[in-house]
């Protein structure tokens, strides 16, 4: 009997998760399918419980439901400490967060070392929470820069219980960029074709790495600037595929072909 998985969010029409997971199921000849479901916040609990009672294997949870998912199913330690869940497993009846691990795996697979490295994270929203958590757990020193300095300071204060984290403004950004080994963009800047990147080539050099979580477009203005400076670059599809692979493994106990998932996502864009 086929096992169904899916992603719930609002909106969810542009999700690449079905393409990635179905490609992995096909490659492994597994009798499973993955679909997307648009669910508003007021219906989230009913949708999750309904999927469970219908025999689904599990769900991914995306914007804007990641925090609410913690209140519906018992979170594991990582999801609890991050304050958000993106993966629900109905066999274990647990909520997990694979975003942090996906970001770290993307950096590692891109040849970037993290222990004792300085990292500048742009943005202090939900995506930043998972990324900063993953970084400090790997022994990096993290500076969070945000337009609203108080928000960066608040996130840094919370994450400081897990490692070395500081909050700052976007003022004098060039100096802050030059002081670190890695720059990570967790903001939506770059989704618009005319968006101007916060970090430009004159702030960077070839010893640094730049990671942009934005994946529409894959080649963001920030990554173009980084390449022009000779810096190492990692794009958002790399993280998307790896967080998806972690969810797949939680549900099935099988390590999926990450290369197949990543290629299918790139081909779908």
From Swiss-Prot:
It catalyses: shikimate + NADP(+) = 3-dehydroshikimate + NADPH + H(+). Keywords: Amino-acid biosynthesis, Aromatic amino acid biosynthesis, NADP, Oxidoreductase. NCBIfam families: aroE, PRK00258.3-3. This is Shikimate dehydrogenase (NADP(+)). SUPFAM superfamilies: Aminoacid dehydrogenase-like, N-terminal domain, NAD(P)-binding Rossmann-fold domains. It comes from Methanocella arvoryzae (strain DSM 22066 / NBRC 105507 / MRE50). It is an enzyme of class 1 (oxidoreductase). Gene3D superfamilies: Leucine Dehydrogenase, chain A, domain 1, NAD(P)-binding Rossmann-like Domain. Pathway: Metabolic intermediate biosynthesis; chorismate biosynthesis; chorismate from D-erythrose 4-phosphate and phosphoenolpyruvate: step 4/7. GO terms for molecular function: NADP binding; shikimate 3-dehydrogenase (NADP+) activity. One of its GO terms (biological process) is chorismate biosynthetic process.
